[in-house]
Amino acid sequence: MARLSSRELALERRKALTTSGKKSSVAAGDGANRVRTASDVRPTRTDAAAAVEPTAPAVSAPVKPTVSFTPASPSSSSHVKPQRHPSRDLVLARRDALSRRGKTADTSRDRNRADVARQTQAAAPVAASAEEQKTCGCGGKRAAGKVQLSAPTTSLKPRSDRRSAAPKRRAIENPSRALVLARREAMAKHGKTAGKQPTSAAAVARQANPDLTSRELAQQVRELRTKAGARNKQSAGATRPTGPNRHGAKQAAAADAHWKVGESTTSTGQTVTGTQANRSVKTTGNEASTCRSITGTEYLGAEVFQTFCQQAPEPTTPAKVRVTATSHGNRVTGNEVGRSEKVTGDEPGTCKSVTGTEYISANQSAAYCGSSQVSQRKVGHSLTQQGRPVSGVMVGRSSSVTGDEAGAGRSLTGDQYLGSDPLPDGRPAAKVGQSGTLSGTGVTGTLVGRSSQVTGNEFGSCHRVTGDQYISAEQVNAFCGSKPEPEAAKVGFSITNRNQVVSGTRTGRSERVTGDEPGTCKAVTGTPYAGLENAGQHCGTSAVQAIRERTPVRLGTPSAAMTGIQPGVGGVMTGDEKGACEAVTGTPYVGADQLATACGNEAPAGTDSHGQAPEGAAWTRFSVMSPARAAQQQRDDQGAVTGTSYEQGNRITGPFDLAGGKVTGTEQFRFDNREFQRRQFQPTVAVVSEPAEQPASRVTGEGSSTKITGDDWDRGEHVTGTEGVSARRRNPTRPGPMSATVPHERKRNEENEWPVSRVTGSSGNTEKGSLITVSGGARG
């Protein structure tokens, strides 16, 4: 049966699958037409002998036991055989060889027709002998029922055959290129460890072509030696031999090498560095014209003239860069463009002063003119009034300029533009005038009044105008001879009932307005819009006093005298002196007695001791206080009222809420106490005085009567306000009569006898004790 190629087998298998389905895969996978082992694949790729089986493998693997499958019946046409994968076995064998020996085990080469034709004739007799040896005498009857499994084998050829079969590479002529290529190949194979390998000629040749023989390697080394010499003879890692110097003591000190960059000095004293072109003692033939003076650039240093000529050269060429001085002492370097003794025709204008940039130095002016003229500075220097230097364009006054005399001697506010230098003399003209109004207010600025040097503005000089006053008081005094009365103040000042100054538009009574007389001398509640000076001018002393008394006094710093523990000042505690004598707003915690004792004449306004000494005026009382006087003063200082007393000192506030004739709480709610009203408001005989005859009023119409509706100008029975029975009934916060409630049950404290108090101190100092034991606050 003829052997089929892989392509023909694939076509047959596909045809069988299309006709018989998957059942034909067993018959198609029969290995009778395709028998390939691992031993015949390697020669196929290398020797191109595809159809010839090898006679004997180079390395024989142990043969595994044969597994035979016996069919159930001899007549069965289907046989199950294990599938073989020779390609897979070849790949596994190749990978195993590469993992063991690296790339040297890879013997695959590119096949061509010449190699196949050359190896076909040699492989034919070998295949025939192999077939004869395989004949066992059974005629091949047992081959159908037995499957022989053999391990893949790999035939290894000698290294010499593989090297001889490879084409001989051409030697690299450029050693640098060979070194670079060898390094790159070594880095690609071995990584960074390849850089530590020696770089000798043999190593370079071996890395370039690993298949070189010893003879070829020696030829490559000789070729590199002929081109590069013996510099690569030693290895890179070798070191030079070291040891004691046998002739070290006999060796002389090494002479200093000549400086590459020398330093020399010119005839003018300047230092020049670079390559020295001077004359040397060790060189002959350059003695001519050494000490002669030449024109142009001097290449010889001053030390050459001092060594060989014993004198300094005379400079015949002028300096290329000269240094001159200006009239102000500044140094200027560059080309000198002044007058020269060797040039004629430049004498005119030598000693004349010019404006602009100064091109002539002060040295030439002193040489040809005898003295140098100082020109004007372009950048001036001055000092401020505080002594700080200022440079720049000077904007001050100059004696050569007229018209800048105005305001030269005045001190201005803001940035200082003039220095502290003395100003030149000139005509002082006032740029900013000073004047005064008729009311005495000073005004500064440009004067727009009448002047004696201007005609035509005499009309209306002495007339009075309304509005803003543009004419000063000096003009009126100079041209009119009399000073008119000033206009009314635009912003008035008034005094309130508490002696505070208020400025603004005045809304009080005026003598030039009629109809605002009613209510001038009446005390009003609320915010007063008319100042206290109106009452003083138009009303009597009693009316002013009534207005002052009518003004409510709010709680302030100097409160009433208090008993008990007071957080005041002047005690045994230190550190409370700061701010003790200053007026504060809010609840007063310091009594007037403590404030007067601690502060004295420094007490805030509103206290009795304001502006007075605490002990009074001198020689007004005894220096020694009697016991009776001390007891009276103690009774005055420590009254029977605890807390703040607003109106009277004989009322007790605090826990004594059920004492007879005692008022609890705020005393301003006394209108609900009927007993207090009957005792306080007893009918008295009023003294009726005949009213004086009032002058006839000039006001007619509405407001002609003395009664004014609206604001409470008159405290009458027909006017409602904030006090009286009607106010008490209208205010729901104040309790009314108790007729609609349950009768009040008297408590037991009113029936018991009051004990005599034996507690002194902060209990109120009353002669009767308290029956309350739980409420707290009765006893300190």
Curated annotation (Swiss-Prot):
Q: Which UniProt keywords apply?
A: Repeat
Q: Which family does it belong to?
A: Belongs to the CsoS2 family.
Q: Where is this region: C-terminal domain?
A: 609-749
Annotated protein name in UniProt: Carboxysome assembly protein CsoS2
> Which organism was this protein described from?
Parasynechococcus marenigrum (strain WH8102)
Annotated M-repeat repeat ranges: 260-309, 320-369, 378-417, 431-480, 490-535, 541-599
Regions of compositional bias (Low complexity) in chain numbering = 48-78, 117-130, 264-276, 387-403, 432-444
Task: Give positions of region: C-terminal peptide.
Answer: 750-780
Keyword Isomerase tagged = no
- What the protein does? Required for alpha-carboxysome (Cb) assembly, mediates interaction between RuBisCO and the carboxysome shell. The protein is probably intrinsically disordered. The C-terminal repeats act as the encapsulation signal to target proteins to the Cb; they are necessary and sufficient to target both CsoS2 and foreign proteins to the Cb. The N-terminal repeats of this protein bind simultaneously to both subunits of RuBisCO.
Q: Where is the composition biased (Polar residues)?
A: 641-651, 759-768
Repeat (C-repeat) residue spans along the chain: 623-669, 693-726
Record-linked InterPro entries: CSOS2/2B
* Domains (record comment): Has 3 domains; the N-terminal domain has 4 short repeats and binds RuBisCO. The central region has 6 longer repeats. The C-terminal domain has 2 repeats and a highly conserved C-terminal peptide. The C-repeats serve as the encapsulation signal for the alpha-carboxysome, and are able to target foreign proteins to this organelle.
Induction is noted as: Down-regulated with rising temperature (from 25 to 28 degrees Celsius) in both nitrate- and urea-grown cells (at protein level).
Q: Where is this region: Disordered?
A: 1-173, 189-212, 226-281, 330-349, 382-444, 631-661, 686-780
Q: Where is this region: Middle region?
A: 260-608
Comp. bias (Basic and acidic residues): 1-15, 86-116, 709-720
Mind listing the GO molecular function terms for this protein? Answer: structural constituent of carboxysome shell
Alphabetized Pfam families for the sequence: CsoS2_M
Is Lyase there in the keyword field? no
